[in-house]
Curated annotation (Swiss-Prot):
Family recorded in the similarity comment: Belongs to the SAA family.
Cellular component GO terms, alphabetical: high-density lipoprotein particle
Organism this protein belongs to: Mus musculus (Mouse)
Tissue spec: Expressed by the liver; secreted in plasma.
Protein name: Serum amyloid A-2 protein
Function: Major acute phase reactant.
Length: 122
């Protein structure tokens, strides 16, 4: 537990070095909100094979906030995928989700993963 806490703290500290502390924290909270919005949209849409798009979109939106958003998106994505893999989700699907996460965080268009026919609302 101490190791995990130390890693999170160091990640936070490294992210803060790029800008002001309050700016970073604000970006992180806004990025977490972007991730939550993508998750709720994914659940609302219930679209078959749409999860990669929502992963990429949530990470993309969060990353647009700045370094704090990138940090939040990475931590949330990693935690979610680790949790799902631990509880029996396939390794290949987890890796595909992580690729979509990285795609979005890098600033690439999340529509690359958009499934055909998904309503324009999303």
């Amino acid at each position: 537990m101490k190791l995990l806490t130390s890693l999170v703290f160091c990640s936070l500290l490294l992210g803060v070095c790029h800008g002001g502390f309050f700016s970073f924290i604000g970006e992180a909270f806004q990025g977490a909100g972007d991730m939550w919005r993508a998750y709720t949209d994914m659940k609302e849409a219930g679209w078959k094979d749409g999860d990669k798009y929502f992963h990429a979109r949530g990470n993309y939106d969060a990353a647009q906030r700045g370094p704090g958003g990138v940090w939040a998106a990475e931590k949330i994505s990693d935690a979610r995928e680790s949790f799902q893999e631990f509880f029996g989700r396939g390794h290949e699907d987890t890796m595909a989700d992580q690729e979509a996460n990285r795609h979005g965080r890098s600033g690439k268009d999340p529509n690359y993963y958009r499934p055909p026919g998904l309503p324009a609302k999303y």
